[in-house]
Structures are given as structure tokens and as C-alpha cells.
Amino acid sequence: MAMNFVTFNQDYSYLAVGSVSPPSATSKGFRIFTTDPFAKSYETKEGNIAIIEMLFSTSLVALILSPRRLQITNTKRQSTICELTFPTTVLAVRLNRKRLVIVLEDQIYLYDIQTMKLLYTIQTSPNPNAICALSPSSDNCYLAYPLPQKAPPSSFNPPSHTPPGTTHVSPTSGEVLIFDTLKLEAINVIEAHRSPLACITLNSDGTLLATASDKGTIIRVFSVPDGHKLYQFRRGSMPSRIFSMSFNTTSTLLCVSSSTETIHLFKLSHPTSSPDTSPSSPVGRDRSLSQSSSGYSPDRGDLTGDVGSSDFPARKHNGTLMGMIRRTSQNVGSTVAAKVGGYLPKGVSEMWEPTRDFAWFKLPKPSQTSGGSGNNGPLRSVVAMSSNTPQVMVVTSDGNFYVFSIDLSKGGEGTLTKQYSVLESNDRLGYSVTDY
């Protein structure tokens, strides 16, 4: 079995895995799992699934079975509700209780999910990576996507982390357009980054937007719909591809995964609070390097890679005198920075903002026998946070489902507590490989 697509539902209570296989093989279709406890809920071996999206905990699923064909299915009744064919390849599907969104490379279709009536068609600039987010909320029913450009960029340099010999297509811009899918009108444009967007996500209430550019060093969080910047975090100093971002259900934490295979959690506390008292992460120590640069600008992380490495080995605080002095100086420095920053112009004061992650953990190295997509590239991952316990759930492209526990009071390095496989095709499907 080859895993072709993986996604969580809107409240992270279910996980869906779509698979493809050669015509001679029998392992294809899709599977749906409950996440807590982890168990198989539904399975079908029909069809090569390119995309699957669930509607909360209902039996309604949206499937892309061929590049241009959408099928809405009721898994409980084993029936097809409707089928739609589009002029070009469907790149992404988003849905909530009010709207169904179909993303093509240069168009977005909006449907009333109750009647499947086409409500609106949005013309976009080329968006081959299907960068788009729909709020799960039925009240704040906002859609976010890259702002269309009037003309394509005259020149574009691919990011340094793009593998040699590959074609890198730039998204439209670093600006995000907020569209009200109930009123069917654009309501705001958020200037998120100078570099092209790589990943965006909305929280469960539709009141917060997280963004990352293709540099992957800076993560920003804005209020929706007014577009005020509330937080600015540094993931690391070296460029990296952001694979997934997810708020927890209470919007107090933001989880980010990237090609470094380190998962970062950022705390959405009051903007004036300082997270520097939390244990240092592998990338947190790079912050002093980037902030001491005399040529610092607010978007420096978007424009160039800072000196340093984002993969220092993690280490705990030591109990020596020098260790105590170091921690004390960090706390004093953050307090002074907060006060001094208030007297500086906005563009300069941003260098003083607290940007360290609150918690982090490193994904285990994939085994040689792992299944997955068969891709020899970086280990891709999708992240979500449990609504019931302080845990982070991660699904990787090699077919593993990990559960990490985090300390909400202290932060620091998370602990791997459970590991499952989503690729087994026999009765042991979803069995616990490891239960720590």
C-alpha cells in the first residue's frame, strides 16, 4: 500500500488516509481512524484516492477519485450523494457545515454544502500548491488564499532548500486575501510576508490566521478579519519547507511541522508576555544570532537565511553557576527588550519580540522497512493537537502515527508516548507498534 493523502477532520477527532496502488494490487481506497483512542472506524478498498476530506464526525466525505472528478459520499449508507466534474485538476478540497470549497490551479469554486448549489467562482493567480484555508466555523466562515497578482513576477529565485534539478513554481505573493463565504465578498488583504506563501491555516473559530513563507523561518499570526499582527515566531535560522500548521481547539498553541523533522509548538499567550523562561529548544538558541545582526529587518527571516543551524542537539538546563547566570541573563534581557521595544519604531522594535518556541520534539528516524509514498525526499508530516489531552498527533509520509505528550506548564521537549501504523492491510490495522 502507498499512502497518497492524509488529513484530520475539523476537530481532529478523526484521521483519514487515502491510498493508491497499481491495477494488479488489491490495496487501495481509503481508511478512517478515530484518534483517541486510535482505532479503525471505516475502510473501503475501492478507488485510487487522490484527496479525501471529512466533515467533522459525520459520515459525509468528499473524494477526488480522478484528477477532475469530485464525489460526495455517505460512508454509513454506502451511497454517492453527488458527483461533479471540473475543467482542470482539483488540487484541494475544503469544507465546513456551510460551504464546500474546490481549489483548482487558477480558480476556486464555492458551493452551498446543503444543496450543492454553485454560489461563486473566484479567479486566482496560479496556485499550484493549493494554498488555501477555510475556517471550520459556520459563523466566521472565512476563506483565506494568496492575493492574486495583476502580473506575474518578472524574476523569481527558488528558495535555497529546493532540491537541485527540480522545478519550483512560486505561489502568487506573500499577501493573504480574506473572503467571507457567507456574504460572498472579499473583506481584507493581509500583508503577511515579502516572500511567497508556503502554508496558511485558520483556527477553529475563524478568528486567527497563521502564515509561513517559502523560507520557513518566520511564522506569523494575525487576527481575522481585521488583519492585525498578534504574534511573530521564529521557527529556525535556516530555510525549511513548512508542511503543516495547526492551532489547538482553544487557540492557545500553534503547532508547526517542517522538513527539518522537528515539530515546534508556539504559545499564544498575551503579546507582552515573554516565553524566554521556557526551556531552550534546538532552534531557540539561534535567536541570539539572528537578533544581533546589524542588518536586521522585520522580514529578514523571509529574505535570507541567517547564520547558524536549526538542528542543534537538544540539551537540558544544567545546575552549574554559569547555567544559572545564563538563565538569569535571558530573563533580564527579555524584560529590558520588552521595555526598550516600546520606544522604538515598529520596524525596529520587531527584533525584540519574543520568538522562541514553547515546546518541541524530534520525529523518530524512519525505518528502512517503512511503507508510505515511496518518496526518497524529506519526511513529510501533518500535525494536529488533541482536544482532550495535552498531546500532539503527527502522521508522517512513511505511514506512522505518533502521539507526543507535552508539559503545558513548563514546555520544553515533548515525549513520545504512542506510535501506530496506518499502512497495515490486515486485521492488525491500526495496531500499536509502541506504547510507551
Swiss-Prot record:
It is found in: Preautophagosomal structure membrane; Vacuole membrane; Endosome membrane. Residues 269-282 have a biased composition (Low complexity). WD repeats lie at residues 192-232, 237-276, 374-414. The keyword Transport applies. It comes from the Eukaryota. A motif (L/FRRG motif) lies at residues 233-237. Transmembrane segments: none annotated. GO terms for cellular component: cytosol; endosome membrane; fungal-type vacuole membrane; phagophore assembly site membrane. Keywords: Autophagy, Endosome, Membrane, Protein transport, Repeat, Transport, Vacuole, WD repeat. SUPFAM superfamilies: WD40 repeat-like. GO terms for biological process: autophagy of mitochondrion; glycophagy; nucleophagy; pexophagy; protein localization to phagophore assembly site; protein transport. Residues 268-315 are annotated as: Disordered. Disulfide bonds: none annotated. InterPro entries: PROPPIN (IPR048720), WD40/YVTN_repeat-like_dom_sf (IPR015943), WD40_repeat_dom_sf (IPR036322), WD40_rpt (IPR001680). It is a peripheral membrane protein. Belongs to the WD repeat PROPPIN family. Component of the PI(3,5)P2 regulatory complex. The PI(3,5)P2 regulatory complex regulates both the synthesis and turnover of phosphatidylinositol 3,5-bisphosphate (PtdIns(3,5)P2). Necessary for proper vacuole morphology. Plays an important role in osmotically-induced vacuole fragmentation. Required for cytoplasm to vacuole transport (Cvt) vesicle formation, pexophagy and starvation-induced autophagy. Involved in correct atg9 trafficking to the pre-autophagosomal structure. Might also be involved in premeiotic DNA replication. The N-terminus might form a beta-propeller domain involved in specific binding to phosphatidylinositol 3,5-bisphosphate (PIP2), leading to the association of the protein to the membrane. The L/FRRG motif is essential for the cytoplasm to vacuole transport (Cvt) pathway, for the recruitment of atg8 and atg16 to the PAS in nutrient-rich medium, and for its recruitment to and dissociation from the PAS under starvation conditions. This is Autophagy-related protein 18. It comes from Aspergillus fumigatus (strain ATCC MYA-4609 / CBS 101355 / FGSC A1100 / Af293) (Neosartorya fumigata).
